[in-house]
């Protein structure tokens, strides 16, 4: 059985296999999403026992089939304890990768954005701009991101200095007011310019709602209309812990 070269990776999800093992879904730098069999990982003294989401790992595996065997998993940094909202945000980005990417389809640029998202999630809890950036970069890497630079009907471009609102329609792109389609989401021109750019700085808080709605609708098209479990859990958590009037606001920041 061939041992593959090592790779940097993050755990997206794992579930039991047999009495002592785990099936682990990894997001790796060179292979993209990779499923591996972690033999004996459920034993308390196993070297693989600390595998969990949110930990950067250096991994090696044996074999090239659909489910190679995990041979080594070394921690590359400390695991930072996350609060419930941070955990739900981590679950959210991991669920997007699990639902929308295929195994062994590498996305090195997206891997870097994923790591930047985890860093921001730990250092800026409660802010949602890095999730919007991840969503947009995911769509771009998968070839699904619509053109945000021009009106899909007339070709006019949004002006960041303008207070004008544009219209966003999932799977079709953006439209100026003169060509507004039905069932579209209003979004600030400056927010569109930010969304199609590098997105290295925070978005304006006033954009949170429109950015979230636009990207949520776009993602739902590719999720086959089947909602994400992480969104359901976020709403349930906020209903238990926050007054009803703050739920929408916290959703806009956290997802």
Curated annotation (Swiss-Prot):
Keyword annotations: DNA damage, DNA recombination, DNA repair
One of the GO BP terms on file: DNA recombination
Keyword DNA repair: yes
Domain of life: Bacteria
One term under GO cellular component: bacterial nucleoid
Function of the protein: Involved in DNA repair and RecF pathway recombination.
HAMAP family reported for this sequence: RecO (MF_00201)
Family statement: Belongs to the RecO family.
Protein name according to UniProt: DNA repair protein RecO
Naturally occurring in which organism (per UniProt): Acidithiobacillus ferrooxidans (strain ATCC 23270 / DSM 14882 / CIP 104768 / NCIMB 8455)
